[in-house]
């Protein structure tokens, strides 16, 4: 009921609210925008400062109630803006912050439930301000009911203001995300799967919402960011507990997808996207390094173990916005080096892999019109075939007269072919080299 009243108050036309509306000057609009940003930053920094420093000696139950009071204060600010000032921007900011702070409240209740369920076996963070142990079951139950009630009411009001068109989708996603956040599970082998599932669920919702132009405005972006907050809280919380190989891989995969693909939906800043691209690239490489560290003993590491790094760089070169040619060039150099060491050490399947990789590099060079992968691919193919030169020599020595006859026939046929098609061969060679010169 309260949320509906807030909606009705906020969507009233400005002409009905103010009988004689006045036009706000550009300077005033800028000042009010800066003031709103300043106020939001002050609220967030103050809350973070309190969590980190100001509540070390406060009992866990009181910490929750202080945070709850701050959330209610933000909602009260939204009501004042909506009913008293008849102003929408401030109300959106207050209720948006209130919805975001509720995820923090959910994480606190989750810490209480986990500490009670696990008892002395609970894995507690090293920081006292993150420990919520020794809270009575009755108080935990009350906190859980209050948090659940506020989660629905505040989220309903917030998403109604920010993106009323997609209220059901946002509310449903928020409830599921916070429900997973409250689970009393900290197992290093289970949490990564929960994080991965929640991430892809939120990402699917995010992609659906992004297709609506209204959700690309500031209000829509804020609503989309709020539903993702439980995921980032869960990731941050998992880093405070014993890590695992699965967690490292899952977080790295999320970083790759977010930095290479998803961040483009939020910003067009060249600097941010450039930095994010390198973070995503390093995360992709870190995935393979983590797999090697987990499953391969250092004494069994060969040069071929690092071939997937070249594959990763080449695959990313088709998705990144900056230095795509550099990615392919580095990938080609790595491939050449690995093929060289594999062939010189006469590793099993080295010539076959060298020929196969060389063909792929050659095709890529033709597709992207680049010299490095094309020439590198030709070198790999030639090196792979030269590896079998020893077998050709052995064949020749075992039956020299047959080999000599076959070689003589091949030489005569080659001479006849060159003589009959001399002009075509020269013309096509000239076209070939001119085309190669025009490539990057």
Predicted regions and their residues:
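Alpha-helical multi-pass membrane segments and their bilayer interfacial helix-loop junctions
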Residues: 1-440
